[in-house]
Design a protein with these regions (language model features):
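Acidic/His-rich, divalent-metal-binding segments that scaffold phosphate/diphosphate chemistry
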Residues: 1-91
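Charged/polar, low-hydrophobicity segments characteristic of intrinsically disordered regions
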Residues: 4-12, 141-145, 196-197
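Residues that form generic nucleotide/phosphate-binding pockets
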Residues: 9-10, 22-26, 35, 64, ...
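A generic short alpha-helical patch detector that favors 3-5-residue windows
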Residues: 28-31, 53, 100, 154, ...
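Alpha-helix boundary/interfacial micro-motifs
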Residues: 31-32, 44, 93, 97-98, ...
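Divalent metal-dependent catalytic cores for phosphoryl transfer on phosphate-bearing substrates
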Residues: 63-175
Length: 197
């Protein structure tokens, strides 16, 4: 089994607790994915991340993956915050990780190419990671306030996977009701596009 196959096997362990424990404890995974385990001890703002450091958040994202999810979502959940290891700073007494989405996309590309993943899924995972902060930046309360630019993102064929990533990300941070409501609003927006209303 190649390293890529091994990680994918672990990402698709049906029991979420077993999957979580594997990623927490397996030395082979630590050797294969130094980008992920560099997140150990990287702080996050407790008000938004009561679960702890970035590695704890990442392991919970892996835990919350829905059964039978596709490889793009699984890899995006695993790698979505790897950029925080390089971007996290204290700014004016607050923990910030400006640009972690873009830096994380670059790190994810390098890791996935190193592991030998095909180009198309690499591009999709990179796009998901680069785009995963959209929900935080939009803060839209009703569909009539969505801009043309935002509708273009919603129309992207990968957007439903991005919504699944946003949900997994929110669940890994304690399932904040406001974040979950945002995900549902964006699902309604996508449905509106899909049915042409």
């Amino acid at each position: 089994m190649t390293d890529l196959e091994y990680v994918e096997h672990c990402l698709h362990i049906p029991d979420p607790q077993e999957r979580y424990a594997r990623f927490r404890d397996d030395p082979r995974l630590r050797a294969i994915l130094p980008e992920v385990y560099a997140l150990d001890g990287v702080p996050q703002p407790p008000a938004y991340h009561p679960e702890g450091d970035v590695l704890a958040h990442t392991l919970l994202a892996v835990f919350h993956l829905p059964g039978g999810c596709g490889r793009r979502l699984a890899w995006a959940a695993l790698l979505h915050d790897v950029g925080k290891a390089l971007t996290t700073r204290e700014v004016a007494g607050r923990i910030r990780s400006f640009g972690h989405d873009r830096k994380g996309a670059d790190l994810a590309r390098a890791a996935l190419e190193r592991l030998g993943m095909e180009e198309a899924p690499v591009e999709d995972v990179v796009w998901l990671i680069a785009s995963h902060m959209f929900a935080l930046s939009w803060q839209i309360e009703n569909l009539d306030r969505i801009s043309r630019r935002q509708w273009r993102l919603i129309a992207d064929p990968r957007f439903p996977i991005l919504l699944d990533l946003a949900e997994v990300d929110a669940l890994a941070a304690g399932g904040n009701p406001k974040k979950m409501a945002q995900v549902e609003l964006y699902r309604k927006a996508r449905l509106r596009l899909d049915i042409g209303v």
